[in-house]
Amino acid sequence: MSLAEFGIKTKSGKMERMSFGIARSELMPGAKNAVDVCLGVREGEQVALIADEVSRSVAASLEQALQDRGAQSTGLLLEDLGPRPLNGAPEPVLEALETADVGVLCMTPQPGELSARMSIVRVVERRQIRYAHMIGVTAEIMQQGMCTDYRLVDLLSDRLRERMLRAETLTVKTEAGTLFSAYFDRGLDWVKTSGLISPRYWSNLPAGEVFTTPASVDGTFVCDATAGDYFNGKYGDLQKTPLVLEISGGRLVRAECKRKDLEEEFWSYCHTDENSDRVGELAFGTNLGLSRMIGILLQDEKFPGVHIAFGDPYGSQTHADWKSRTHVDVLTRNCDVWIDRDQVIEKGHYQMNHLGLA
């Protein structure tokens, strides 16, 4: 199905808007921050705005912010393009991104849809357009994480990236039982996604991460917050039923949880392919505007601290030379974090003086 077959017409090569509905006033500050500051949308630019039914109110606020900016947007509702879960990226979505200056995706993930989202990202990276990936976004997030001062987030993220480019080890500890060390390959990049989006790096919104693919990780990671992909929506906050993960040589070797259904499903997911059990991402959360975790991965992974993910290493950004069909983040709470021997996070709070920002 093409854009024309879907019923979206163009005039003189410009994309026309399909309305997502009436924007809610309380979501507009976050929407304007996304459009004006994070994406830097300019008058006359072409924007592909993709959403699902659950995220429709968020899309409506972004649509209004784009209109206020003088941009031309194409709205695409995923449920109009085929059944969910998506087996692949719908053709009208890919076609819209092929001609857009800017792309935005707002959706709630469902099992088996990661490959469809990765197909969208491949178009974004090939064309090097500014792109916001808002997977799991809610009205609450628009009023919290999307109202952050992203220029401050960018400053902290820059300092952390500079430190980690020189670092040899990272140690993370929590009272819940997390204790692991990570080691790094100087040939792999540390990537900053601070919310100020450029053609070089697309970003989740809300933003605030500095991440790499670690050379190796050893120890215990207790996921007592949220897990990624569809696990977040299915199992929610894991504070009362933490997932205890043992890692050796950068690979998951054991998983334990009081909820045996979660334990078995997570273990199976992390053995989908030969690299699904491999730690593909280690990330700092750098969104200083967040005061608490809310049980939604999209925002909680930006909370000050360190988290990891098993599976695909985003090699197009980190330069890791391996791949996986899966990617699942795991989060923990109230981290103590040392870069080499210097403690930079204490109980989930950055020690700004240790980063030259006091």
Language-model segments: what does each one mean?
Residues 171, 181, 220-222, 244-246, ...:
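Structured core elements
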Residues 295-357:
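Internal helix-turn-beta structural module
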Residues 239-241, 330-331:
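Short, small/polar residue-rich loop motifs at catalytic or cofactor-binding pockets
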Residues 2-240, 338-358:
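Active-site bordering "gate/hinge" segments
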Residues 241-256, 336-337:
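Active-site and channel-lining beta-strand-loop segments
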Residues 238-239, 255-310, 316-317:
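Dual-mode signal for accessory low-complexity, basic/Gly-rich regions
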Residues 189, 228-230, 289-291, 315-316:
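Short, acidic Gly/Pro/Ser/Thr-rich loop/turn segments
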